[in-house]
């Protein structure tokens, strides 16, 4: 009898153990099912036309993300893509990654969000981004852990009521003497830095990032060489600058879609901080690479080029991006933005350069002539202008800055005559004065990388030239 009872007891314990294991397995399966992507809709890849992937049978919205079936070395390695357009039954996608390994008829799955809507990528926002380097999709590039963020946003463009903008009245101290004294910038202004390659653009940007009085700095490195991205972070910006900065990088070798996303994401981050009453400095290097990425996609979609290979849509894309920055009366924060524009030869013939100059609130021109002389920063004062400067400085500084530019222009236009001794003193009063104080003018315009010149000191230095 005892043996029978013992047997029943053993069987009961065994059944309880099996039941507990069964419940554990169910819980495990439920957990694994919850982690599966919500994918219920898929189409088939029928064509690859340049950058564009053409899919049939896919019912999804523009901006939503998809997974494309891919096989590499016999293993599945699906890649992410985004819907950018459609025509009839065809849907057009652009991949975020290299498309090597994609095959005809590959299945293209539409991602579905938890609310059963099409999946649109949400990007991290918040103070946790400071000191981090991310790509255009919010993924870390600095080999640090993923960001545990409280806030997120989708990339979207929207128009801002012009009556919600506040006039620019406050000076922004950039720490650069030539800019503070002669091209004074206001908080909330939009400025372009026009430069060809190799004349100190990155160094000037680094000085602006390090010395400008701003709460938060957002830097978008669009289409730059990978080496330059690392060099800018480590050697030009430095650890002190990085600690109050967010860097969004999309190097030259990534998808044009990622470059566009990076530019928009950086602007989103700047908008988040200004809405939280922060004064934000947004630096985008470069606007030209952003325009080139837009051109690649537009031409692949079949748009016709209208000017220097650029389609007509570029003339709305650039203003849409730039106009999201500024100063607004509903918030105490602001976004002051610097956009670099690459120029080669006659920049007036370049549609991006021409458009940027018309949209921005001023431009700083860098000169190869000055750079070749070892004159840094290589700012061409004659060709540069700050459109809000007359409204934010006193009459004395404005008069001195205007006269300074006249002296420089007169000297540069007669440099050859001066150098060969052909100029006769007394012929031109302005030129006589320029020759007399030229060493002082040159000294004012030049500044070491490690030297900071605040706004008041810059104004004092300008005043001393004419005493």
Curated annotation (Swiss-Prot):
The keyword Translocase applies. CDD domains: ATP-synt_flagellum-secretory_path_III_N, ATPase_flagellum-secretory_path_III. It comes from the Bacteria. InterPro entries: AAA+_ATPase (IPR003593), ATPase_alpha/beta_chains (IPR050053), ATPase_F1/V1/A1_a/bsu_nucl-bd (IPR000194), ATPase_T3SS_FliI/YscN (IPR005714), P-loop_NTPase (IPR027417), T3SS_ATPase_C (IPR040627). One of its GO terms (molecular function) is ATP binding. Keywords: ATP synthesis, ATP-binding, Bacterial flagellum biogenesis, Bacterial flagellum protein export, Cytoplasm, Hydrogen ion transport, Ion transport, Nucleotide-binding, Protein transport, Translocase, Transport. Its EC number is 7.1.2.2. GO terms for biological process: bacterial-type flagellum organization; protein secretion by the type III secretion system. It holds the Pfam family ATP-synt_ab. It catalyses: ATP + H2O + 4 H(+)(in) = ADP + phosphate + 5 H(+)(out). ATP binds at residues 195-202. Disulfide bonds: none annotated. It is found in: Cytoplasm. It is an enzyme of class 7 (translocase). GO terms for cellular component: cytoplasm; type III protein secretion system complex. Its main location: cytoplasm. Probable catalytic subunit of a protein translocase for flagellum-specific export, or a proton translocase involved in local circuits at the flagellum. May be involved in a specialized protein export pathway that proceeds without signal peptide cleavage. Belongs to the ATPase alpha/beta chains family. This is Flagellum-specific ATP synthase. It comes from Buchnera aphidicola subsp. Acyrthosiphon pisum (strain APS). The lineage of its organism: Bacteria, Pseudomonadati, Pseudomonadota, Gammaproteobacteria, Enterobacterales.
């Amino acid at each position: 009898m005892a043996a029978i009872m013992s047997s029943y007891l053993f069987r009961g314990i065994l059944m309880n153990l099996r039941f507990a294991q069964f419940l554990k397995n169910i819980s495990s399966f439920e957990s694994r099912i919850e982690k599966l992507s919500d994918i219920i809709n898929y189409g088939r890849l029928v064509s690859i036309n340049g950058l564009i992937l053409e899919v049939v049978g896919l019912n999804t919205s523009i901006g939503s993300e998809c997974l494309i079936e891919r096989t590499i070395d016999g293993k599945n390695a699906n890649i992410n893509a985004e819907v950018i357009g459609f025509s009839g039954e065809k849907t057009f996608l652009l991949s975020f990654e290299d498309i090597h390994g994609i095959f005809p008829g590959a299945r293209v799955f539409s991602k579905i969000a938890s609310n059963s809507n099409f999946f649109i990528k949400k990007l991290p926002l918040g103070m946790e981004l400071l000191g981090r380097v991310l790509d255009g999709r919010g993924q870390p590039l600095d080999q640090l852990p993923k960001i545990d963020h409280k806030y997120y946003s989708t990339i979207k463009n929207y128009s801002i009521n012009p009556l919600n903008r506040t006039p620019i009245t406050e000076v922004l101290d950039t720490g650069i003497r030539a800019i503070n004294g002669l091209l004074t910038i206001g908080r909330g202004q939009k400025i372009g830095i026009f430069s060809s390659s190799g004349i100190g653009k990155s160094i000037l940007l680094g000085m602006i990032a390090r010395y400008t009085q701003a709460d938060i700095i957002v830097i978008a490195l669009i289409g730059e060489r990978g080496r330059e991205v690392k060099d800018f972070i480590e050697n030009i910006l430095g650890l002190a600058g990085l600690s109050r900065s967010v860097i969004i990088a999309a190097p030259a070798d990534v998808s044009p879609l990622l470059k566009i996303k990076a530019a928009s994401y950086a602007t989103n981050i700047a908008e988040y901080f200004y809405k939280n009453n922060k004064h934000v400095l947004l630096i985008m290097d470069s606007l030209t690479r952003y325009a080139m990425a837009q051109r690649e996609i537009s031409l692949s979609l079949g748009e016709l080029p209208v000017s220097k290979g650029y389609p007509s849509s570029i003339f709305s894309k650039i203003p849409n991006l730039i106009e999201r920055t500024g100063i607004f009366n509903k918030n105490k924060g602001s976004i002051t933005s610097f956009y670099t524009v690459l120029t080669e030869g006659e920049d007036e013939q370049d549609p991006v350069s021409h458009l940027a100059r018309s949209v921005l609130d001023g431009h700083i021109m860098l000169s190869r002539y000055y750079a070749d002389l070892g004159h840094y920063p290589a700012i061409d004062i004659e060709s540069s202008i700050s459109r809000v400067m007359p409204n934010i400085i006193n009459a004395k500084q404005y008069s001195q800055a205007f006269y300074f530019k006249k002296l420089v222009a007169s000297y540069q236009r007669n440099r050859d005559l001066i150098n060969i001794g052909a100029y006769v003193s007394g012929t031109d009063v302005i030129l006589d004065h320029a020759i007399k104080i030229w060493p002082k003018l040159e000294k004012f315009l030049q500044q070491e990388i490690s030297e900071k010149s605040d706004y008041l000191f810059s104004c004092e230095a300008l005043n001393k030239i004419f005493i």
